[in-house]
A protein has these predicted regions:
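Conserved GHKL (Bergerat-fold) ATPase module
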Residues: 1-170
Length: 170
């Protein structure tokens, strides 16, 4: 089902005692669609929004969750690049929003963000580009590594790759 952005689908516990299911103050906004349980002795039993927002221990839980998400995405891409590319359309909005909102998360996922490419999907040592369902995906670093020495270092971004296909194949 759809994630409830207001309520969240992560339950907070302190030493196995239910505290809250209002997690907006604990995890970053871009991770609210996650489902699960956080059980930590660092979560205060007396929960108020202002207490959660100002508690340094609670903020560190949000950073920890973001780090675990980026680690899991990195492992998925490394272990199953094609599976990662297949899931990318569903993951992309959250990863990209997270990268825009959280500088630390952006550094953690910079090599995990995929872009569609017109490059032929031929297997290289680094596995770039990744072929998936007739499409090819690359990372920004993968694109840069394929540039010829005499080629200008430029990156083309398209908002509508079908309508702009002629220009992109230049």
């Amino acid at each position: 089902g759809r994630a409830d952005w207001e309520k969240g689908e992560i339950k907070l516990y302190c030493n196995q005692v239910f505290v809250s299911d209002s997690i907006k103050e604990v995890v970053p906004r871009y991770l609210l669609p996650l489902r699960g349980v956080i059980d930590s002795p660092d979560i205060p039993l007396n929960v108020s929004r202002s207490a959660l927002q100002t508690d340094r221990r609670v903020r560190s839980i949000g950073n920890f969750v973001a780090k675990k998400v980026s680690d899991r995405l990195r492992n998925l891409k490394k272990e199953d690049p094609k599976g990662y590319a297949e899931a990318w359309d569903a993951l992309a909005p959250f990863v990209k929003i997270g990268a825009m909102e959280d500088e630390k998360f952006a550094e953690q996922v910079s090599e995990l963000i995929l872009f569609a490419t017109t490059a032929a999907a031929r297997e290289r040592e680094d596995g770039d580009p990744i072929a998936c369902d007739g499409r090819a995906f690359t990372t920004l670093e993968g694109y840069r590594s394929r540039l010829a020495a005499d080629q200008k270092k430029r990156v083309l971004y398209s908002t509508d790759d079908v309508a702009q296909a002629g220009a992109l194949n230049l």
